[in-house]
A protein has these predicted regions:
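N-terminal amphipathic/basic-hydrophobic helices that include classical n-h-c signal peptides
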Residues: 1-29
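Tandem repeat scaffolds
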Residues: 18-96
Length: 284
């Protein structure tokens, strides 16, 4: 449910170990923070004050919250099934997201070469309008995070990485597919990102990151323009990046990941852009 959660969920079957030699740390505000730990797997938490608890980028299959109470509970991520007070709300949420963002369904259901072309046409149009809107804001706002989510510039960097990995490396098998400003999901260890040549602490401006980003979008345009059924069914000679599982990657799947990333991250971007423009922050 909800497609690819912004910046947090490992794409399409990418699993990572949660074991770590440093599972716990405390921030300057003395808030306990647990990172890459499996100590809560299968745990039972009873009669505890969990107000304000935040869980990000975690495997939560089988998570149960029973007989609990509170004013607001926010849930976001990639869930196959969600049940609230014995009511399965999965289909409702998916339908509502599709209603608000019709392009989600196009990207999800793309099957023929024409479907991929049509969806990419719409993605290009959406981002062009959104970036024009974003340029009306001061540059500083474009680096500002809303509720801990990635900034607009970080979003563009992530989409650059996603297309570098799934298109440039997996589909096209380029000699040097990864741009240094690419920004992977939070689950990729820093040493693995460095091995790909990524500079995670870079601080490019929006215009600077859009230069390689738009070149990669133009590459995607050329690919979908020449797409055939045979090409869609071709097995790729590489996986997207070294941390990804060793399995078969078909062009159809790889291009669909690119479409899905573009659509979902556009959804998050316009949500946060409304806040940066002076709107109310969504209640969470």
């Amino acid at each position: 449910m909800g497609g690819l959660r912004r910046r947090r969920v490992a794409p399409l079957g990418q699993h990572r170990s949660v074991a770590s030699t440093q599972p716990f740390r405390q921030t300057a505000s003395m808030t306990a923070e647990y990172v890459q730990s499996d100590q809560f797997r299968g745990a039972r938490i009873h009669l505890c004050d969990l107000a304000g608890l935040e869980i990000r980028d975690c495997e939560v299959s089988g998570l149960k919250v029973v007989d609990c109470y509170g004013s607001t509970v926010y849930l976001g991520g990639d869930f196959k099934r969600v049940v609230v007070n014995d009511v399965d709300v999965t289909t409702y949420v998916e339908a509502e997201l599709d209603r608000q963002h019709p392009l989600r369904r196009l990207a999800r259901e793309a099957a023929s070469p024409d479907d991929y072309r049509t969806t990419w046409d719409a993605i290009e149009t959406l981002w062009a309008a959104t970036l024009e809107r974003a340029r009306r804001l001061p540059e500083g706002k474009l680096h500002e995070r809303v509720d801990g989510e990635w900034s607009l510039v970080e979003t563009q960097r992530h989409l650059l990485f996603a297309s570098d990995a799934w298109l440039g490396n997996a589909v096209l098998e380029e000699d040097a597919p990864y741009h240094p400003w690419g920004f992977p999901s939070g689950g990729m260890p820093a040493d693995q990102a460095a091995q790909l040549g990524l500079t995670l602490d870079a601080t490019p401006t929006l215009d600077e990151v859009l230069a390689p980003r738009q070149r990669r979008m133009a590459t995607m345009r050329r690919v979908v323009e020449g797409l055939t059924e045979a090409e869609l069914d071709r097995s790729c000679g590489r996986k997207p990046a070294e941390p990804y599982p060793d399995q078969e990657y078909v062009v159809r799947r790889c291009l669909k990941v690119v479409l899905g990333e573009e659509v979902e991250h556009h959804r998050y971007a316009v949500r946060d852009l409304a806040v940066l423009e002076g709107g109310e922050r969504p209640e969470r």
